[in-house]
């Protein structure tokens, strides 16, 4: 039996630009658990307010915190994955560690497929978001 640990997080834009934010927000705000109301209202809010107005404005904030290697969330998630894998390997514990995001690459389902392809028969999911909400636990 090969065990695996999947570090799960919400996700992040691929780049600190209006386009990067729009792509991320389009997927994120399409989830009915994020906006738990009428699908038509969700579509209107996403496509007529959030994508055209909020994404360009927030892109500036993302650009200020963006790191040389990418989004802080992705950079630190990658570092945590590598550190945990190194620790398990050093202890001689056969545990595969991967990171998966709900709304951006690397996606949770891709990480799970990779773990299964590597022979994982037991996968422990570890949510890295600190709060309970249907957008993080039910999606």
Indicate where each model-derived feature is located.
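Active-site-proximal alpha-helix that buttresses catalytic centers in soluble enzyme cores
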Residues: 1-139
């Amino acid at each position: 039996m090969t065990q695996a640990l999947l570090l799960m997080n919400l996700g992040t834009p691929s780049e600190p630009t209006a386009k990067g934010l729009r792509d991320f927000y389009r997927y994120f705000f399409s989830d009915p658990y994020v906006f738990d109301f009428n699908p038509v209202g969700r579509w209107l809010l996403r496509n007529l307010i959030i994508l055209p107005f909020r994404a360009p404005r927030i892109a500036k904030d993302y650009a200020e915190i963006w790191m040389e290697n990418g989004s802080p969330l992705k950079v630190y998630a990658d570092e945590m994955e590598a550190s945990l894998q190194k620790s398990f390997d050093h202890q001689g514990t056969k545990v595969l560690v991967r990171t998966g995001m709900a709304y951006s690459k690397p996606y949770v389902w891709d990480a799970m497929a990779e773990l299964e392809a590597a022979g994982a028969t037991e996968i422990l999911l570890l949510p890295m978001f600190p709060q309970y909400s249907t957008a993080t636990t039910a999606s």
